Amino acid sequence: MQDTNVFDLVVVGSGAAGMAAALTAAHHGLSAIVIEKAQRWGGSSARSGGGLWMPGNPVLREQAPADDIEAARTYLHGIVGAEAGTARIDTYIDRGPEVFEFLQRHTPLDMRWVPGYSDYYPEVEGGRAHGRSVEPKPFDARRLGSELATLERDYAPGPRNFVLTQADFRQLHLGLRNPRFLPRALAIGARWAKANLLRQQLRTRGQALMAMLRSGLLDANIPLWLDTALVAAREDDGRVTGVVVRREGVEQFVEARRGVVIAAGGFEHSAEMRERYQRQPIGTGWTVGARGNTGDGIRVGQSVGAAVEFMSDAWWGPSIPLPRVPWFCLAERNLPGSLIVNERGERFMNESLPYVEATHRMYGGVHGQGTGPGENLPAWLIFDQRYRNRYSFAGLTPRQAIPRRWLDSGAVTRADSLAALGERIGVPAATLAATVARFNGFAHAGKDADFGRGESAYDRYYGDPRQRPNPNLGALEQGPFYAAKMVPGDLGTKGGLVTDSDARVLRADGSVIAGLYAAGNASAPVMGHTYAGPGATIGPALVFAYLAARHAAAVLPARG
């Protein structure tokens, strides 16, 4: 083992939580280092939408309709309940604006409100239909220099400088059904041409967020070691004093005088942990999380006595298992002319539910919990040719043919009739026909009498305003008909190390493991089994990473 490296704070993981912890430490008088197992930095945060759900932040105060932070508190308590700890909820609400402002001061963080991107439960007291989510503006990442080459790749990469924001996607997915489609498409094209002319390196969504945070680390001269795997934590008299890592094939000890922050993501790519903790069917091939997320930080925490919670849950989303990468379905389920059935040919939910809730319904039981296999899996998204002609689907433009490899893989099935479609996917044809007929009646009436699809502002965000009287309901009548296989995909796992309001890791008896902190998907979620709104994963990751570093630096004066 090589000579010891000594830092005040050692941060494991280079996603949003890890970078926020290191930045906070550096600007509060501590020396810090970030270690990253992968050969690229950014983690799942770089593959995400990059949005933040942080009520009361300065961007919302400036751009969004007046909001009461107490309403956000009421809302979050209302949807989460007591299972994730009421003190942590209050801490998140109270400290969020402070964290946002800190990042604005010490990084080129530049965000904007996403109008109308609703909270995921807007009808709950305190929920907001106009939304509380902010997203990164397009960011020229040339300032990163050579570091840009090792940024974790985007989930859905495109041509250089052809980048889309969440606000762009909202205007494009309806195609020519949306009168704003052409103006927005022209604006995107002009942005692309200008960026190419100026030789920019534009990034949006999670790519932009992580490039902004990485800029802050570079400005603060915080070292980041790539290809450095966490092996173990070292304790001295009950306190974590550092970590053993493997770098360039050699194990070495990195001493942490103030503490270690585990921000290494979840365990979505660990088949063993998913098999142990999560309900079937499950696998590592349906996630869009970073490949390095194999639960290393969680296991190391457990090895020193840490408790874990919510290990059976994830940041789920119904997904299509396409041959190369899974497609995480956002708008597809909300658009008129589609419905979801189980293998019995029955609808079992409002298809337009927020993605975590929708996948919980696919598994069945309260919050998707249970001991047996999922009750409504496999599931199928059924749609017709009119739907395909009108709307984008899984990255395809309206009317674009379904790729042959999708059909050959079984991810998507096509047939001239509903009866033939049912036979091909193993669903009772008569039941499927009856289900579609009943649904078509709801579509013509404009009211889903079974599941209330289209009644929530969240449902309508991805709906078609030109579809009357309900933007989420349309009859399936024009063949050929299609079935896209729906699997329980995810953005990452939810469960992790139990922490308190200072992000200190706790044992099962509630006692603190001194010197050990956790944030992000390595920690148990403040959101519990729910998901408050767009950006409700990264928002808490930033806040509790900041609080971990602040706690570690508590006896030292801040530098700004």
Regions found by a protein language model. Name each.
Residues 13, 246, 256-257, 262-264, ...:
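Short, well-ordered coil/turn residues at beta-beta hairpins
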Residues 37-223, 340, 347, 386-389, ...:
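Conserved N-terminal/central alpha/beta ligand/cofactor-binding core
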Residues 9-34:
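N-terminal Rossmann-like FAD-binding beta1-loop-alpha1 element of flavoenzymes
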Residues 125, 130, 135-183, 298-300, ...:
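An anion/pyrophosphate-binding glycine-rich loop and adjacent beta-alpha core
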Residues 232, 236-239, 431-526, 530:
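A glycine-rich dinucleotide-binding beta-alpha-beta segment and adjacent secondary-structure elements
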Residues 1-9, 27, 207, 211, ...:
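Extreme N-terminal leader/targeting segments of oxidoreductases
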Residues 300-307, 433, 540-559:
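Internal hydrophobic alpha-helix adjacent to the cofactor/substrate pocket in enzyme cavities
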Residues 200-207, 219, 247-327, 538, ...:
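Glycine-rich loop(s) and the adjacent beta-strand/alpha-helix scaffold that form part
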